[in-house]
Amino acid sequence: MNSWTFQADTLNLDYLQSDEFVKKSAELRGSVMMIGPLLARFGRAVITKPGGDQIGRRRLDTHFLGFQKLGAKFRQVEGRDVYEITAQPSPTTHHPSPTTLKGTYMLLDEASVTGTANIVMAAVLAKGTTTIYNAACEPYLQQLCKMLNRMGARISGIASNLLTIEGVSELHGTEHTILPDMIEVGSFIGMAALVGTGVRIKDVSIDNLGIIPDVFRRMGIKVKEEGDDLFIPQQRHYEIQSFMDGTIMTLADAPWPGLTPDLLSVLITVATQARGSVLFHQKMFESRLFFVDKLIDMGAQIILCDPHRAVVVGHDRKRQLRGGRMSSPDIRAGIALLIAAMSARGTSRIDNIQQIDRGYENIEGRLNALGARITRITAP
């Protein structure tokens, strides 16, 4: 188990203005998550347009509107594509805190996971009470709130869409064990179902997987819960269920506790070898289904109805996908294509694998240990 210790007694805030910081933060969408903690502690943060997956519009309005509700101000730095966010008292005003953030009521325009988390991290040190309605309540958010409470924060309503935060003057250190990545768990369930001869996924924190195991069961996949492990036996055949009225099964993404959109790509790949048909409805992003063209090139029977919907007609393992060369457009499509390649006849080559690396650590090492034959090729 990897353990890390963090201590940040002194930070170089001038680094936020450097070209190096701007360049690095523009390459990583997660850089936006520094705004909340920096505002809470120092009353100042800098942000440029962050990078990340190209899966459609992924606006940051929820973050910024929340910070503005707390009293932060935004200013574009002249001559640079950079915004400075401040919540600092005037130098001529005696203020006991380094920030002027004040608690308030806010109704989020969407239940954004990262938006809620960012606002929570700012609000815990704001003066007064902050109420966040339509808050995200994914396990990721729950564990953040629980960790902050152990650090001295006062957050109630955890696991609901209504969070109440009583601001405190300071936080202290704590120990925290990070939850298993439920998207990685779901990806391995799909992989084991399609190509495995019996795979055990250990220490998955079953209570925090929500409906993920049941969605695979609706696809006809046998998923056994054994303690805190999941065992996926070899699936010689698996049949997609129909609705009770006999109509075609529809699987659609939704905010938690609904089906996470991050698993639709894997589920689509798994469906290509199922018995029966299923309609996938990707509601939350408009470009995430375009990768199915690559599965079609491999021999999958998929009808792309529009940017949000695709019908998969399974082969029932009667026709194997064929290998080919493809490129990973984003993290989740990348792992789905890797799963498809593992099940395909012949050799496949996947380019742009840094997308997969962003979400799956040492993926080829772990899969090769299970019997896969994956070779990483370093480009000249």
Task: Name each region found by the language model.
Residues 1-380:
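Short, structured segments at the rim of ligand-binding sites
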